């Protein structure tokens, strides 16, 4: 996944020109006939989105997501409340615009020429490519030419349908596919994971997030090059909303807020390691349950799952772990650090976790106050790994090379430079293995994402099992000993095949010749 960087100078110029052209309708709040005035009068910004880790996601009662945070800040910018509507698929999103049930769509949607004919795109803030995925162990397709509607299913309204049509017309005449009129991309990825589908197509960022929890999903083919992601709003003569969106993104860039959000949600990208992720998730099932109470006990204001991810990166949750340099235990503490924290046994799980948590808190307290709150943890982790002094050197080097020393995105790019002699000779604290600190922090972020997503999946499975159990009638001991002549389970199948047919009612897929969008 490659970030699509906005030409903010161009956006600024376009914003000014557009504002000048729209001067009769600005200030936006003065006239009831324009979109901004209508939003102000209503007192809420109506945004439709999709439920996904990147766009909008409920994690333990807290809503997170790149598009959610951007939409919330845009609502604040307009001085109104945010009203979010979550839809199941992309077609339903555009239906909301068509039916005037939404002011804009913020859902990681890709810009293309077909969509721009009917809807107004906003600025682009990252990019994705569309990819065919399959399940590890299944048959991997080697070319698009072999795919047919018995194998490949895509979500309704998906931008890739236009690309598939073009490929069919120009290159692969036998290419065909199904469109499931109900299920979104995430649900189709689940079906591939569960071996109910052979292949589907999703964007590279969605796949990257999904693989952190389900490593058995693998990329088979690239369908497209990088495509810009944007918001969409209604397309008509009233351009006040699109002008406001342009101005908002321009101000977000100038303040550095957009860069921080991109780093928060997109900065952990990189090559996916199937073996490492699978090993981690197996350890979550087999080892973490014994350690989780300790992580929860000593995490304090740190997310316990982040503390657990740090420990896995340090020791793979091995209390007896010892490195060639002499650091030991679950949190791999040095002897001097352990003594300063009053620890007597670094291989004792509770002592190691409590000591590591306190040491990390100390590092966070030392991070300069100018660093944004949500990024302080990454600076602290770099200091935890290579030492606080070298973290200060990395900040100083960032400032000298015209970067922002308070931006983790800028600082982490300079970390590998700390091992280059022409540069570290000019730094206060000299040589450091900055490339290791970079990998250290990035790995922890990936483990945290995997852990959060995996635990959420397990909670959903438990909830689903309870709902299924509650749907069956309760049988008393008396009824067991004196069964009625009429079965209390009237829908029990008469054969194994019949059971499958009755208990797996799957909505039919529809083969389409021409997608609606």
Curated annotation (Swiss-Prot):
Mode of membrane association: Peripheral membrane protein
Domain of life the protein comes from: Bacteria
Keywords for this protein: Cell outer membrane, Cell wall biogenesis/degradation, Lyase, Membrane, Signal
SUPFAM superfamilies named in the record: Lysozyme-like, Periplasmic binding protein-like II
NCBIfam families, sorted: PRK10859.1 (NF008112)
Function of the molecule: Murein-degrading enzyme that degrades murein glycan strands and insoluble, high-molecular weight murein sacculi, with the concomitant formation of a 1,6-anhydromuramoyl product. Lytic transglycosylases (LTs) play an integral role in the metabolism of the peptidoglycan (PG) sacculus. Their lytic action creates space within the PG sacculus to allow for its expansion as well as for the insertion of various structures such as secretion systems and flagella.
Entry protein name: Membrane-bound lytic murein transglycosylase F
